[in-house]
Each structure stands twice: as structure tokens, then as C-alpha cells.
Amino acid sequence: MNKQKGITDMGVKFDRLVYGGDYNPDQWLEYPDILEEDIRLMKKAHVNTVSLGIFAWAKLEPQEGVYDFDWMEEIINRLYENGISVFLATPSGARPHWLADRYPEVLRVNEMRQRNIFGQRHNHCYTSPIYRQKVRQINMKLAERFDHHPGVLMWHISNEYGGECHCPLCQSAFRSWLKKRYNNDIKEVNRKWNTAFWSHDYQNFDQIESPTPLGETSIHGLVLDWKRFVSHQSVDFCKAEIQALRDAGGTKPATTNLMYNFPTINYHEMAKVLDVVSWDNYPQWHKGPERLIAMDNGMQHDIMRTLKKEPFILMESCRDRQTGSLSAN
């Protein structure tokens, strides 16, 4: 069996404990003195690495096709001059307003078949060709500009992949996925899903819809295959993001920050498209028996270690879930 590429194969040499966290200077660009004070405090705290640009799409591309990377380069330069490296993010984790306004198909549709309006964070369709195109474009631009920079240590792909979309594009993709899985044989679908129960047999693939309280949720095979499909779309989206970097000449290793046992992603499949596994650990202390919370977090570390059977990166953490929620809001 071929060994998956991992952190030891990609030339990532950590000659020190990589220590830091997310840094979002795009939120206060009008106050340049903050950067200098932040750098002073980072050095005092022995921070040597930050994740940069995770939610910066609106600043990187304020208008469609109009890119502004100068501020990012200045920040990377100043950090590097002070011994601070960067995990540079692709910004697909939160889209700009102009993208949703002009291309509403990028917004998710919930299980009740209602399309979301602009807002929140994970509110984008992984199937949407427009969203994939726009993400590919900005990823390639970022790779062309920054992959060669000595201060950029790795690529941080998006942020905490998760969630699902029930839009017409996803319904069509789901049916295509089912046709491939079941050799275009609707009778095989009925047999595997045991749809004869309650007389729920399908006559053709066009009748199949994703699980919804408005319709079907009782067929376990449908629910399970939908989860498999959503995981497939999420992993494929991440793979496409990384491919955009590679197509633009990017050679730096790529990771994405996983997050506990998200039910919509098979992390073993996600790990196959990553060079390095990383995850976000936010223990929810004081919400139950602390022994069990500690055991669960220990188990999560074990799971992350087994995904590639190599060292992993703890990308985010916090003293408690409440602090994390406050910092996010």
C-alpha cells in the first residue's frame, strides 16, 4: 500500500514548537498602529506562527475581479521580519456580500427547501459551479502572489468545512452520485434501501430528493447515502481548492482545520487530499461530567493522529467554549 504524503514528506521543517493562533488584521486595517503593537505582544508571548486571511475575502476582492493584496503582503512582510511565519488561508469560509448579491445560487438551501439570505459563515453551496469558479480564481491569485514568500509556511484551506445544502444543484448532483453508486439501476436502490417498507419504492432517479421533514426521512438508506454524498461534495470542494493552488504553481503543503466529529464529513476521506492534518479543539467544560469531556477530547486527538498516522497540528483551541464563542462574536 502506498503511504499517503504527510508532514514529513512535504518539506515542512519545524525547528521549533509552532505556536500561535488565528490573526485577523483585515478587521482593523484603518489602524496600522495596531499591527505594530500586536507584533510586540506576539513576540512577548513567544508567538512564532499565525493563521492569516481566513475571513478576509471582502478585503482581498472588494469588488468582483478587483483584487487588493498589497495590505496582505505588507502584513506578511512585517510578521516575517519579526520571526513570525504564516499559515496563509484561502478565504472560502466566508463569502463577500457582492458574491451572494450577484450569484444567489452560492447561498445554501436548507432541508425545508428555503434558500438562505446573506449572513452567517457556513452559508455557501459546495456544488455551485459559480462558487467553485470564484474560489478557484482567488486561490490561484493568492498562490501566484504568496506561495514563494519565505514567510508563508503552509496553506490553510478554508475554515472548518461542514454543513449541507439542499438546492436544485445539489439535488441533481445527488442523483448523479446515486446513479454512479448503483450502476444506474433504480431497482438496486430500492432493494438496498428497502423502500418496499411503507410502499416507498422509486420508479426513477428523478423522484429521489434529499431527506426533508417535508417529505422523506424514514428511509435509512436514503439518509445514510445523503450523508455520504454531502461528505463527498465537501471533500471534493477541498480537493478543488488545493488543486487551484497547485495549478498556479503553489508548492507549499496544504491543510484544513477539522472540527470534532462533524456528521457531514468523513475525515478519513478528507485526510487523503491533505498534506497535513490539523484540527480545532474547543472543549466544552462545565457542560457535563468533566471526566467524560476530557476523555472525549483525548479521543479526538487520537482520531486526528490516526488519519494519516503522522503528527498533526492543533490549529485552534481555547480555554473553554464560552470564551471561543465570545471571541467569534
What kind of feature is each model-predicted range?
Residues 209-227, 281-282, 300-329:
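Active-site clefts of carbohydrate-active enzymes
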